[in-house]
A protein has these predicted regions:
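Pocket-lining segment of extracytoplasmic ligand-binding domains
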Residues: 116, 197-200, 206-296
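Short, low-complexity disordered leader/linker segments with a strong preference
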Residues: 1-53, 363-377
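Conserved C-terminal helix/tail region of periplasmic/extracytoplasmic solute-binding proteins
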Residues: 328-377
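Short linear loop/turn motifs
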Residues: 88, 96, 192, 235-236, ...
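Secondary-structure end/capping motifs
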Residues: 257-343
Length: 377
């Protein structure tokens, strides 16, 4: 569903009414932004008049999810307002669509991946987009099956029927995955379906496995009654394709015209990320409370956030380099793999798609010490 935009003040009043009514119920997709909110600090910046702030329009990669907790926390606690920004957001309709709309100038910033952006840039050289920070150090690209199908290793996929939507990123990259794990891609029979039917096809036995994002597929399969031990997951990042996940993307022309705005956004976002790492339950609660549709499944969102916390947000690379950075050699290798997997004509270099000049100093984007991190509950 399409979600309405709201001012930072509007959501503050919304939360105040909830508190007065002793209600703090779960919601389901996404509401727009606000300064202040549950748990926000009593900071003058959090109540700065919106007319004094720079409006920044953001598009998510999909519906608002627990993976967006850093953004929601940064909004609620007034971190963007402290940097002079009034951030509003809308849901997305998939990574590729989000990038396309960013390129048209409908949004100032977006959350999506660099690899679809490479393809977009080749087709739209005059509307080039770039990544200014990595938000997910590991991509959730995966092939998933059920134990009952007898697929216990990637090689067991030979001759099987796989399912995914036509534009699915992991599906487009599957030939590279197959090459890494010893599967003949020509032996695979692909079935195409709508994204919302992907897990259903697997559950009904119409396909032997699916490609997609683990953060989407696993919560759906668990909600359908499967147990974690029933699900077999082959991550691309564990099989020779060490892709980064989502990033903060901006149009290149916007970044050049508004460098301080981009820097301010990135700085505030990673303050939110640090808070989520310290207290993921509070981050999850903030997302649930921010959604106005009241359809969000807290347990499914908890599973989604748990996956991100364990394998996407904090990795040895992030511990070493801080949030937002990218390893040049690793990124170039994945760019080269994308060129091959997507059949791109150009051969981009790291500087063509990623810039670290908008990141705050490393000391401001460090991973919180383990002793300061609460468990997700």
């Amino acid at each position: 569903m399409i979600h309405r935009k709201a001012s930072l003040k509007g959501l503050s009043r919304f939360f105040l009414l909830l508190a007065c009514a002793a209600l703090f119920t779960g919601c389901a997709t996404q509401s727009p932004t606000a300064s202040g909110g549950p748990g926000s600090s009593a900071n003058p910046a959090a109540t700065t008049d919106k007319k004094d702030l720079k409006d920044v329009r953001v598009q998510l990669s999909f519906l608002m999810q627990s993976l967006d907790a850093p953004l929601i926390v940064a909004i609620n606690k007034g971190y963007f307002a402290e940097e002079g920004l009034n951030v509003s957001f809308e849901r997305g309709f998939g990574n590729a669509d989000t990038i396309s709309k960013l390129g048209t100038g409908k949004f100032d910033m977006a959350f999506s991946d660099m690899y679809n952006a490479l393809e977009f840039n080749e087709k739209n050289p005059n509307d080039k987009v770039i990544a200014v920070a990595v938000t997910q150090n590991k991509a959730p690209f995966a092939v998933l099956s059920l134990k009952e199908r007898g697929i216990s290793s990637p090689k067991d996929l030979n001759g099987k029927k796989l399912g995914a939507p036509a534009g699915d990123g992991p599906r487009k990259l599957f030939p590279l995955f197959a090459q890494e794990v010893g599967v003949d891609p020509k032996s695979i029979e692909w079935t195409t379906m709508e994204p919302k039917l992907r897990e259903t096809f697997l559950l009904q036995g119409k396909v032997d496995a699916i490609s997609g994002f683990s953060t989407s597929a696993i919560p759906s399969l668990l909600k359908a009654g499967k147990k974690p031990e029933d699900i077999t997951t082959f991550y691309y990042t564990e099989n020779g394709l060490d892709f980064y996940g989502n990033t903060i993307l901006v149009k290149d022309s916007f970044a050049k015209a508004n460098p301080e705005v981009v820097k301010a956004f990135v700085k505030a976002y990673f303050r939110g990320m640090q808070d989520v790492i310290k207290d993921p339950t509070a981050g999850l609660d903030a997302v649930i409370a921010a959604d106005q549709s009241k359809l969000m499944d807290r347990q499914a969102e908890k599973v989604r956030l748990d996956i991100a916390l364990k394998s996407m947000y904090v990795t040895p690379e992030v511990e070493k380099n801080g949030f937002g950075a990218a390893d040049t050699a690793r990124l170039q290798e994945t760019i080269d793999q994308t060129v091959a997997g997507f059949g791109l004509k150009s051969k981009p270099q790291v500087a063509d798609i990623f810039s670290d000049q908008f990141l705050p100093p490393k000391e401001q984007r460090q991973v919180p010490p383990a002793a300061e991190r609460k468990p997700l509950s």
